């Protein structure tokens, strides 16, 4: 077998696998959105416990039974407000 016919058979063989793997043969006019939400399983019988380990009671106003606020750190943002400015490298080279 010469190289041209071998290459042609190889391409035909690969095309058969790619044709079956692709979804082009069953393409639709509309696009369906895929849900990418991950849900966490939880026992329904268990008592709801807050972040402090205390059991919560039903509240009449404000947040609901299964809601709580998370604490926010006070102070400047450490990524944007540095305590010291960045240092520049020392250059001991003296021009003549």
Swiss-Prot record:
Q: Among its keywords, does the record have Aminoacyl-tRNA synthetase?
A: no
**Which InterPro entries does UniProt cross-reference here?**
CLV3/ESR
Provide the leader sequence positions.
1-21
Question: Does Transferase show up as a keyword for this record?
Answer: no
Query: What's in the GO CC field?
Result: apoplast
- Sample GO molecular function, one term: receptor serine/threonine kinase binding
A GO BP entry is: cell surface receptor signaling pathway
Alphabetized, the UniProt keywords read: Developmental protein, Differentiation, Glycoprotein, Hydroxylation, Secreted, Signal
The highest taxon in the source lineage is Eukaryota
State which tissues express it. First detected in heart stage embryos in a patch of cells between the developing cotyledons. In vegetative and inflorescence meristems, expressed in a small cone of cells at the meristem apex.
The region called Disordered is annotated at 68-96
Subcellular location field = Secreted, Extracellular space
Oligomer status and interactors = Interacts with the extracellular leucine-rich repeat region of CLV1. Interacts with CLV2. CLV3-derived CLE peptides interacts with a tetrameric complex made of two CLV2/CRN heterodimers.
**What else is on record for this protein?**
His-81 seems to be essential for the activity of MCLV3.
Write out the function statement from the record.
Extracellular signal that regulates meristem maintenance. Acts with CLV1 as a ligand-receptor pair in a signal transduction pathway coordinating growth between adjacent meristematic regions and controlling the balance between meristem cell proliferation and differentiation.
Recorded protein name is: Protein CLAVATA 3
What is the primary gene name for this protein? CLV3
């Amino acid at each position: 077998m010469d190289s041209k016919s071998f290459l042609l058979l190889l391409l035909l063989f690969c095309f058969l696998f790619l044709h079956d793997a692709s979804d082009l043969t069953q393409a639709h006019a509309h696009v369906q959105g895929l849900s990418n939400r991950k849900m966490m399983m939880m026992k329904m019988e268990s008592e709801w416990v807050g972040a402090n380990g205390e059991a919560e009671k039903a509240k009449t106003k404000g947040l609901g039974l299964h809601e709580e606020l998370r604490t926010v750190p006070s102070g400047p943002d450490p990524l944007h407000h540095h305590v010291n400015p960045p240092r520049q490298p020392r250059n001991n080279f003296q021009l003549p």
